[in-house]
Amino acid sequence: MDIVEKYFTGLSERQLEQFQQLEGLYREWNEKINVISRKDIDALNVHHVLHSLAIAKVISFKAGTKVLDVGTGGGFPGIPLAIMFPEVDFFLVDSIGKKIKVVEGVAGALGLKNVIARQLRVETMKEKFDFIVSRAVTAFPAFVALTRKRIRENSFNDLSNGILYLKGGDFEEEIRDFKDKISVYNS
């Protein structure tokens, strides 16, 4: 897992071990339940792990922060972030049960005590979180409409509570109506 060490120094031995185990665990699970495309599994560390960790370049979550990962799929960005921030609580949700089974299996194998995974839709939730993370599960305006009531008002991190949304491509059209309310970070 040299690629993670290249961009994130100061990781503990435990974190390094967990990151090193990721590829093998996902390959094993992907044989049973296809959650990552067969051609993409070879680029897991760059396309999924590092992409997820881009959030850690924007914010270093403080201990006790509660993060909701919406549409987590196989556990991205939630699992890599949970390794990076072991004192932060991560709640990973997806509407597809087989994906949650993978998340539970990977989190369990890694010994991640800070991860809870559930099969449910975010619009049915009542709990509030400091941050909501996602990897572009829908158009940004629709995502905001689904999640905005799940964000706590009082912030204690260096960045105000809100949505951290990973998305590639041309995002300008989707965020046009939010220009005065958001910050865009490019990695």
Describe each region flagged by the PLM:
Residues 26, 81, 167:
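Residue-level signal for inorganic ion chemistry
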Residues 87, 91, 95-187:
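S-adenosylmethionine
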Residues 28, 32, 45-63:
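Conserved alpha-helix/loop element of class I SAM-dependent methyltransferases that forms part
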Residues 63-73:
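Conserved class I S-adenosyl-L-methionine
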Residues 74-87:
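Conserved SAM-binding loop of SAM-dependent methyltransferases across substrates and taxa
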Residues 1-38, 42:
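N-terminal auxiliary segments of SAM/dcSAM-dependent transferases
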